[in-house]
């Protein structure tokens, strides 16, 4: 038993050193990318190669960074975008199923799962198999604590950017854990299909069967929304879709990058990948009020809505928020809403922030930021204020909904939702408990590991 613990400790120490070196190399590569010039191309290749090799958490961290223009510059963002399409495919063949057969080569490969196309033998229809990569759960459970420890150490020593990176790791933790169970994704996908059945220009593939590590669904071909020629109709539809998600239905697709939003030849939207869903049903009324208040310039209304949402840090922040609202309204009318917003210290500076954002609001902001970028591609004159005004009727309807009706709606959804989806929070929290245990164990060897790392680096410099 002691020997096993020693071996495990040694293995985790080695992995921790590997992650520490990766973080150091990434820090150096990002600085080279930011400088530009010929050396930046080599740095970009090194960054993508190192991130792909270190594993799923590094890839996910990088993808989360792509929505944080307050942390990462434009050059680095373009490099990070490559990680959505340059994840090496797994080498194992797809599993055998009695009623299905699969092509050996995957049609898509992500950090957590691989997607194969195949045929259903009963009717020869095209289907899709999504499968969690082998051993990815074990890798996540081991690496998350080590990333946190390495970044904690870097933060302690005042390494630039360590605090923001630590924040990113903590942000992506719930999504990572939720994406490990494809049975939960299948239930969420079916729930979305039911909720959005009334939208004629939206398709959500039908799920045929699912288990914890696999999901088989309808094959719906399309092209990426950003592969379509810029079209204002697509911009309006995407905005309308996310307005409905956020303030009407209250369930929001949390990973709306271009690969997960397809366009069919007739202009119909196709949504893929429901591994991460944001539930804001209990807050959608306040979000609607906040949007309306911003548009009409009601500063007190904005503050009240944000207080109802529980996102203002303290009483002292309210006065600063009121001063910032005119700036925010002006920024909402600009073409580069996200870029300009990221320049306000009230949103970005660790010392001056006025918001205490919970995980779901962080994901909501991230999702809407990505959507904003896609909308701006299709409508160069995009203005958030202008678009919101077109949906005043929807916003007014939500603002007037009594709180008891929202409670009834959530309760109704809960009662008709399969047990496996109801237990999603329990699953995530149990995994977080496992990770907390891993962190406690890893901290015991952190000092030794970090000392060894410093010693090795000093020897290399001599």
From Swiss-Prot:
It comes from the Viruses. It holds the Pfam family ABC1. One of its GO terms (cellular component) is membrane. GO terms for biological process: membrane lipid biosynthetic process; regulation of response to reactive oxygen species. InterPro entries: ABC1_dom (IPR004147), Kinase-like_dom_sf (IPR011009), UbiB_kinase (IPR050154). Induction: Expressed in the early phase of the viral replicative cycle. Belongs to the protein kinase superfamily. ADCK protein kinase family. This is Putative ABC transporter A445L. It comes from Paramecium bursaria Chlorella virus 1 (PBCV-1).
